[in-house]
């Protein structure tokens, strides 16, 4: 299903906390508009390239009941896909070139940041955070080489909670090569700049300035219809934010704040 009812710009302009002035001043938005137009909307052969694999990560103690419930929705909507929950034991056997850096990380969620890039680089497929609920299958996006989702657009931020990729995509190779620091001092900014959203966004644009084939960063409606900014408000029906094109709903557990 190709969603053509609204343009990329229309979707982001209707997003929570949209800032027209910031959007107009950032050349990154023009790049995202172009990727969406050329790699998603344009008629093309849509044969599968991304492997039918779903990867999730849970390190440490047993995952909460809600996470188990959300995880089941991914298997339910993708009955023919391979599903893998990566635990501490699995990570022991994963090929991690810079294992010393991984072992030095003290925040469990930041370890997960580190691992998702290596897992997708080696195996391909779709990585999904454990607090995501699947609303519809992702099969019709597998013709792409790489996809991710945009956050709530003041500045361009690409979120890392849901990423699809072929193995050894240039973006992932660039990330793994340049991920040389991973410190957590209690500041989310430090984490975001070394392994998280800000780091990922920087690496993404460094690559797509040259390599644009099959790459799309989808508007928030696709994977993040429920805004992080309103998750703490009382009596909010998060499902009321879901759109016809929404493939997933992020419940924003923000578990990294509590897991060090």
Model-flagged regions — what are they?
Residues 1-112, 130-260:
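Glycosyltransferase-associated regions of secretory-pathway enzymes
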Residues 113-125:
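Small-residue hinge/turn detector
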């Amino acid at each position: 299903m190709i969603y053509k009812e609204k343009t990329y710009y229309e979707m982001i302009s209707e997003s929570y906390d949209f800032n027209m002035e910031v959007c107009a001043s950032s050349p990154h938005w023009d790049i995202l508009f172009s990727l969406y137009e050329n790699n998603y909307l344009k008629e093309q052969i849509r044969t599968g390239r991304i492997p039918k694999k779903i990867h999730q990560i849970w390190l440490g103690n047993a995952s909460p009941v809600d996470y188990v419930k959300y995880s089941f929705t991914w298997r339910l909507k993708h009955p023919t896909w391979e599903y893998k929950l990566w635990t501490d034991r699995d990570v022991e056997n994963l090929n991690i070139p810079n294992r010393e850096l991984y072992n030095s990380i003290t925040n469990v969620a930041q370890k997960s940041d580190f691992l998702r890039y290596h897992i997708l680089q080696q195996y391909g497929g779709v990585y999904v955070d454990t607090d995501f609920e699947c609303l519809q299958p992702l099969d019709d996006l597998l013709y792409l080489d790489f996809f991710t989702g945009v956050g709530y657009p003041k500045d361009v931020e690409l979120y890392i909670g849901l990423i699809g990729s072929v193995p050894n995509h240039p973006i992932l190779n660039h990330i793994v090569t340049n991920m040389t620091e991973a410190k957590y001092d209690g500041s989310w900014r430090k984490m975001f700049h070394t392994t998280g959203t800000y780091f990922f966004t920087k690496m993404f644009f460094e690559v797509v300035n040259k390599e644009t084939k099959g790459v799309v960063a989808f508007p928030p409606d696709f994977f993040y219809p429920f805004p992080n900014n309103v998750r703490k408000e009382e009596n909010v029906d998060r499902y009321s934010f879901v759109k016809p094109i929404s493939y997933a709903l992020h419940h924003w557990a923000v578990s990294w704040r509590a897991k060090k």
